[in-house]
C-alpha cells in the first residue's frame, strides 16, 4: 500500500482545486486532433465528485440547446488547463442527480453562496 501512495503523491498536481458540488465552473481543457492541439471550454454546474485517490473525478452538467450534457473530468488529468469558479453554489447534498429531472430555467438554478470572493 505504501508503494501506491508514493506513486499517487508523485502524480498529483501541486495546485489545490477549490471547488465543490453546486459550483458553476468553466473547465478549460486540451483537445488533440491529429497534429493540432487546441483549448476548449465547458461551462456548467458540478453535480458530483467520485473520490478515488489519484483517480478523483467530477461531473459537470450544462444545458445546450435545450438538451442536458454531462461530462466527467479527472481532477489530476494533464489535459485540464484550468478550472475557473464562476459562482459558488449553496447546496445541501453531495450528489445533485435530481438536477437531471429539471427542465427550463430550474435545470440550472442553485442558490448562490454570498461570502464568495472571486480571485
UniProtKB/Swiss-Prot annotation:
Domain of life, per lineage: Bacteria
GO terms for biological process?
translation
Under Gene3D superfamilies, the record lists: 2.30.30.790
Q: Which UniProt keywords apply?
A: Ribonucleoprotein, Ribosomal protein
Q: GO CC: one term?
A: cytosolic large ribosomal subunit
| GO molecular function terms listed in the Swiss-Prot or TrEMBL record | structural constituent of ribosome
* UniProt key word Ribosomal protein: yes
Matching entries from NCBIfam families are given as: rplS_bact (TIGR01024)
Q: What does this protein do?
A: This protein is located at the 30S-50S ribosomal subunit interface and may play a role in the structure and function of the aminoacyl-tRNA binding site.
The record's comment on protein family reads: Belongs to the bacterial ribosomal protein bL19 family.
Name of the molecule in the record: Large ribosomal subunit protein bL19
Naturally occurring in which organism (per UniProt): Borreliella afzelii (strain PKo)
What is this organism's lineage? Bacteria, Pseudomonadati, Spirochaetota, Spirochaetia, Spirochaetales
Amino acid at each position: 500500500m505504501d508503494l501506491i501512495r508514493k506513486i499517487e503523491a508523485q502524480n498529483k498536481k501541486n495546485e489545490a482545486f477549490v471547488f465543490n458540488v453546486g459550483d458553476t465552473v468553466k473547465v478549460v481543457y486540451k483537445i488533440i486532433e491529429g497534429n493540432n492541439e487546441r483549448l476548449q471550454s465547458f461551462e456548467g454546474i458540478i453535480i458530483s465528485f467520485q473520490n478515488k485517490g489519484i483517480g478523483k473525478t467530477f461531473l459537470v452538467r450544462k444545458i445546450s440547446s435545450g438538451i442536458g450534457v454531462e461530462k466527467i473530468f479527472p481532477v489530476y488529468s494533464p489535459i485540464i488547463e484550468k478550472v475557473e469558479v464562476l459562482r459558488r453554489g449553496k447546496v445541501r447534498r453531495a450528489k445533485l442527480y435530481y438536477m437531471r429531472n429539471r427542465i427550463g430555467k430550474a435545470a440550472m438554478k442553485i442558490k448562490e453562496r454570498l461570502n464568495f470572493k472571486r480571485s
